[in-house]
Regions:
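N-terminal glycine-/serine-/threonine-rich beta1-alpha1-beta2 phosphate-ribose binding loop
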Residues: 1-76, 88-103
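A contiguous active-site-proximal alpha/beta segment in oxidoreductase catalytic domains
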Residues: 76-78, 84-159, 163-166
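Glycine-rich, acidic and aromatic/proline-enriched surface loops and short helix-turn segments
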Residues: 60, 166-167
Length: 168
């Protein structure tokens, strides 16, 4: 969501397998000329010549095919983590990006925060000496507090289930 807020960004398309996704509509209302698609392949084929950068925030199992499809069209790509489910696919993306001179980034925002940069600097400079043991904790509840299994429900009519499943 932050990317489309930047003053130098002109959003030309949004894609979601669920055509009733509320966030999409708020973005479309702010970017009047942007088009909405349910299939990223259709979006890339239709808008390919109008796109410089693609941001991929699809279900994890579709990151590799969506990223590769965008790069094959010569697009710079920002992909949410995990980049791929297989190391070979990650290497293939890296090699392809290097060969085509494409800028790519995988979203791991927390590692770029000030405390991590501060710590990394002090480790590299030898300021804190040899590290023998590390204790880690998180103030966030990363666990799930709900029911152990989701209740059965019908697929919403607005969601293209096959597109969402992708390569799963």
């Amino acid at each position: 969501g932050e990317l489309v807020k930047h003053e130098r960004v002109e959003a030309v398309g949004f894609c979601d397998a669920d055509r009733n996704r509320g966030q999409i509509y708020s973005w479309l209302s702010k970017h009047k000329s942007a088009k909405f698609f349910q299939d990223y392949r259709e979006m890339l084929a239709t808008l390919g010549d109008k796109v410089d950068v693609v941001s991929i925030s699809t279900p994890d199992h579709t990151h590799y095919p969506a990223t590769m499809a965008a790069m094959k069209l010569g697009k710079h790509v920002y992909t949410q983590k995990p980049l791929t489910h297989k190391l070979a696919e990650a290497r293939e993306l890296a090699e392809f990006a290097a060969e085509k001179k494409l800028t790519t980034q995988m979203g791991i925002q927390n590692q770029s925060r000030a405390p991590y940069r501060f710590t990394r600097h002090h480790i590299k400079k030898g300021i804190i000496g040899k590290i023998k043991k590390v204790y880690v904790w998180s103030f966030k509840n990363w666990g799930y507090d709900g029911k152990p299994f989701a209740e059965k429900s019908a697929v919403p009519e607005s969601l293209d289930w096959n597109l969402w499943l992708g390569t799963a």
